[in-house]
UniProtKB/Swiss-Prot annotation:
It comes from Macaca mulatta (Rhesus macaque). This is Protransforming growth factor alpha. SUPFAM superfamilies: EGF/Laminin. The chain crosses the membrane at residues 76-101. Keywords: Cell membrane, Disulfide bond, EGF-like domain, Glycoprotein, Growth factor, Membrane, Mitogen, Secreted, Signal, Transmembrane, Transmembrane helix.
Length: 121
């Protein structure tokens, strides 16, 4: 009984540790459509590690959930950029018109647009 417990408590031998994966042979370089080929040693067959957004045994299917999530994020960023540009344009136009009214009183079109409340001199 002592021998069996000592066998269980000994650390595993480093030489017995073998990787489960190897690089795929040249004959399988195109095995995965959207991923990296890895060779399963114990099963003696290739397998794929898919890139983000793809699923399937050979990474042949687009992951629609990943595509939708990425699309929604892009839409939110695009909307934020468009709103920021429009707000900046409105701010610049407002500043130009105020400057025109304050500094250049002789500008007729400016007075007609903004300075209606002022009494003519």
């Amino acid at each position: 009984l002592e021998n069996s417990t000592s066998l269980l408590s000994d650390p595993p031998v480093a030489a017995a540790v073998v990787s489960h994966f190897n690089d795929c042979p040249d004959s399988h370089t195109q095995f995965c459509f959207h991923g990296t080929c890895r060779f399963l040693v114990q099963e003696d067959r290739p397998a794929c590690v898919c890139h983000s957004g793809y699923v399937g045994a050979r990474c042949e299917h687009a992951d629609l959930l990943a595509v939708v999530a990425a699309s929604q994020k892009k839409q939110a960023i695009t909307a934020l950029v468009v709103v920021s540009i429009v707000a900046l344009a409105v701010l610049i136009i407002t500043c130009v018109l105020i400057h025109c009214c304050q500094v250049r009183k002789h500008c007729e079109w400016c007075r007609a647009l903004i300075c209606r409340h002022e009494k003519p001199s």
